[in-house]
């Protein structure tokens, strides 16, 4: 029967298990260090955002207080100006004798009947004259708003004005079509940040201008800024959680794959001497047959 070298098998298993243990230990230590570093960086970013938020609140409070002070000063100035105007121009009756003169005029009119007829005739004449002149003034007031421009310039002469087709260019002449083409793979992966979509615009002299279509309230040439209480603050792209994926990759599946690979190598190492063993067994069997035949 075939003698299996158990000592060699144990040596191979020990060496392979040592390699697996060292590999797993080193990978775990590296991943823990990376995770700790990422946590420190994220803590620093969150601290910076909190500090920026506090500064923004302080700036808003200072601005509101300053506006209140300015409004109070303006009201005080208006009140003082009103008091000075009241002191310079006191309330007085400009025509104190007008009330006393009216009864005298009525008495004089009632005393002279001939003057009443003259006054009535003159009033009818003035009323007719005003009635005849009223349509003219109405027509003037109606046409005035149509001719006055916003700049105060006189209206243009209708005879000198030309057709609008010959003087004013059509708005379609000023419109230019902008081509938006998708970017190359290198720009798609690295140019636009925070999930932005990259586009390229062909320019003159065979040059290409790249732009980003931002999402999630990001702004900027490369979508690197985000609105924070009305202001745009630089917000770098968040690091992807590759540590968790690395933990999964370098844990049980990798160990299983390495173990299978090591077992395969051990099987190849152990079974490569099988043909020699079989050849020896066959030779021994033939030798026994010859011995029995001779006997």
Swiss-Prot record:
Q: Classify the main location.
A: membrane
Record membrane topology: Single-pass type I membrane protein
Known glycosylation sites: 188, 205
Q: Where is this region: Disordered?
A: 78-111, 124-175
- What is annotated about its quaternary structure and interactions? Interacts with cni.
Report the subcellular localization. Cell membrane
The entry's keywords: Cell membrane, Developmental protein, Differentiation, Disulfide bond, EGF-like domain, Glycoprotein, Membrane, Oogenesis, Signal, Transmembrane, Transmembrane helix
Transmembrane ranges, per UniProt, are: 248-268
Q: What disulfide bonds does the UniProt entry report for this chain? A: 183-198, 192-212, 214-223
Enumerate composition-biased segments (Low complexity). 140-152, 159-171
Which loops or segments lie on the Cytoplasmic side of the membrane, by the record? 269-295
Signal peptide stretch: 1-26
- Biological process (GO), any one: cell surface receptor signaling pathway
**Stretch list, region Interaction with cni:** 215-245
Extracellular side: which ranges?
27-247
- Indicate what this protein is called per its UniProt record: Protein gurken
Gene designation: grk
- Role this protein plays: Critical for defining the anterior-posterior and dorsal-ventral axes of the egg. May signal directly to dorsal follicle cells through the receptor torpedo (top). During oogenesis this signaling pathway instructs follicle cells to follow a dorsal pathway of development rather than the default ventral pathway.
- Kindly give the InterPro entries that the UniProt entry links to this protein: EGF-like_dom, Gurken/Spitz
Instruction: Give GO terms: molecular function aspect only.
Output: epidermal growth factor receptor binding; receptor ligand activity
Q: Domain named EGF-like: which ranges?
A: 179-224
Q: Name one GO cellular component term.
A: extracellular space
Q: What is the lineage of its organism?
A: Eukaryota, Metazoa, Ecdysozoa, Arthropoda, Hexapoda
């Amino acid at each position: 029967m075939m003698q299996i070298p158990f000592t060699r098998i144990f040596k191979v298993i020990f060496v392979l298990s040592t390699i697996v243990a060292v590999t797993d230990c080193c990978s775990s230590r590296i991943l823990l260090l990376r995770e700790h570093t990422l946590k420190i960086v994220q803590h620093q970013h969150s601290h910076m955002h909190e500090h920026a938020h506090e500064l923004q609140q302080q700036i808003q409070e200072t601005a509101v207080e300053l506006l209140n002070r300015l409004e109070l000063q303006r009201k005080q100035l208006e009140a003082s100006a009103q008091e000075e105007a009241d002191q310079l121009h006191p309330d007085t009756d400009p025509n104190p004798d007008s009330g006393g003169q009216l009864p005298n005029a009525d008495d004089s009119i009632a005393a002279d009947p001939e003057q009443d007829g003259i006054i009535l005739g003159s009033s009818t004449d003035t009323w007719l004259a005003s009635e005849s002149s009223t349509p003219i003034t109405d027509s003037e007031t109606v046409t005035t708003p149509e001719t006055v421009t916003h700049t105060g310039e006189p209206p243009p002469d209708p005879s000198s004005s030309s057709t609008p087709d010959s003087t004013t260019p059509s708005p379609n002449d000023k419109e230019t079509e902008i081509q938006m083409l998708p970017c190359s793979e290198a720009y798609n992966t690295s140019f636009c940040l925070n999930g932005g979509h990259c586009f390229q615009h062909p320019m003159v002299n065979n040059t290409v201008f790249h732009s980003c279509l931002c999402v999630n309230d990001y702004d900027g040439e490369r979508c690197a800024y985000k609105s924070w209480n009305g202001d745009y603050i630089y917000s770098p792209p968040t690091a992807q959680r590759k540590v968790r994926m690395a933990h999964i990759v370098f844990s049980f599946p990798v160990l299983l794959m390495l173990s299978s690979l090591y077992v395969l190598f051990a099987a190849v190492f152990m079974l490569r001497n099988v043909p020699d063993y079989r050849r020896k067994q066959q030779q021994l069997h033939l030798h026994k047959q010859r011995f029995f035949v001779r006997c």
